[in-house]
Amino acid sequence: MKRMIALDGAQGEGGGQILRSALSLSMITGQPFTITGIRAGRAKPGLLRQHLTAVKAATEICRATVEGAELGSQRLVFRPGTVRGGDYRFAIGSAGSSTLVLQTVLPALWFADGPSRVEVSGGTDNPSAPPADFIRRVLEPLLAKMGIHQQTTLLRHGFYPAGGGVVATEVSPVASFNTLQLGERGNIVQMRGEVLLAGVPRHVAEREIATLVGSFSLHEQNIHNLPRDQGSGNTVSLEVESENITERFFIVGEKRVSAEVVAAQLVKEVKRYLASPAAVGEYLADQLVLPMALAGAGEFTVAHPSCHLLTNIAVVERFLSVRFSLVEADGVTRVSIE
């Protein structure tokens, strides 16, 4: 019998990423775990609908036995079974992030006995979670280089707080992992701005695009009007294509916050990324830790290691026999497998 791993949900940033990473790694390695203090660092601790959906999805995909899988629970015991490929559908029942549920179960399906399709309904454009276009245009091309083949499709947008969005991913078992080397970003090839609107006046998007154009030379600028029943909501994205990597930054519009202020916040984030020679942005760095650990080698550079990144690394090192090295030099932090 494999040893039970004990995790403290309050460690590091104390959010839901500890639980999501633990579920992924438990399904992959077959190691059971207990986590206490789930989301202890959040204003509303314990399992929310999004986290509970991730637990239930993981349970179904590997026939796990679970204790504590209920709303508000701050303790969970998860004993995994065997990961099975198949056609899965999960509903969050709120505007909780669909992509974070996918992020939990897809790595396990890289080791399944056949191809899979996973569809999740819930929120698709959330302030604190990667949107589907980030997964599709930034993460998945990098995963493909690593030998991981999955394809995400956004079927319907669902803005906070209404939800109602649908995201689906098709994924195949991985034959072998390749290493990823992302030490240098390279020169910028082009930049693209995009605004999504649902039930919001078009002039809001035009003002947001104007703010982006005031700071960057954009190769493309697009405004997409979505059906009103997918809103109301608004997101602004700016994609930076460089020689070695494409990064995408986004922000979700807020009520009673002007279009100019919303777009200016995004401009500030992109300028911070471009001011550093690092290849990888803060959010992408979090996404690369697990596949890099599974490959057993590789490296990337990031401007500053976030608490989120350090917490994720700590969880990965509890389940896998890998050790990460973080070395600061020349204005970047080089993250690699020792």
Curated annotation (Swiss-Prot):
GO biological process, one term: RNA processing
Gene Ontology molecular function: ATP binding; RNA-3'-phosphate cyclase activity
Catalytic activity: a 3'-end 3'-phospho-ribonucleotide-RNA + ATP = a 3'-end 2',3'-cyclophospho-ribonucleotide-RNA + AMP + diphosphate
UniProt-annotated catalytic positions: 308
Annotated keywords: ATP-binding, Cytoplasm, Ligase, Nucleotide-binding
Residues annotated for ATP binding in this entry: 103, 283-287
Signal peptide positions (record): none
Enzyme class at the top of the EC tree: ligase
Its EC number(s): 6.5.1.4
Location(s), subcellular: Cytoplasm
Record's GO cellular component terms: cytoplasm
Organism domain of life: Bacteria
Family: Belongs to the RNA 3'-terminal cyclase family. Type 1 subfamily.
Function: Catalyzes the conversion of 3'-phosphate to a 2',3'-cyclic phosphodiester at the end of RNA. The mechanism of action of the enzyme occurs in 3 steps: (A) adenylation of the enzyme by ATP; (B) transfer of adenylate to an RNA-N3'P to produce RNA-N3'PP5'A; (C) and attack of the adjacent 2'-hydroxyl on the 3'-phosphorus in the diester linkage to produce the cyclic end product. The biological role of this enzyme is unknown but it is likely to function in some aspects of cellular RNA processing.
HAMAP family: RTC (MF_00200)
Protein name: RNA 3'-terminal phosphate cyclase
Species this protein is from: Escherichia coli O127:H6 (strain E2348/69 / EPEC)
Gene assigned in the entry: rtcA
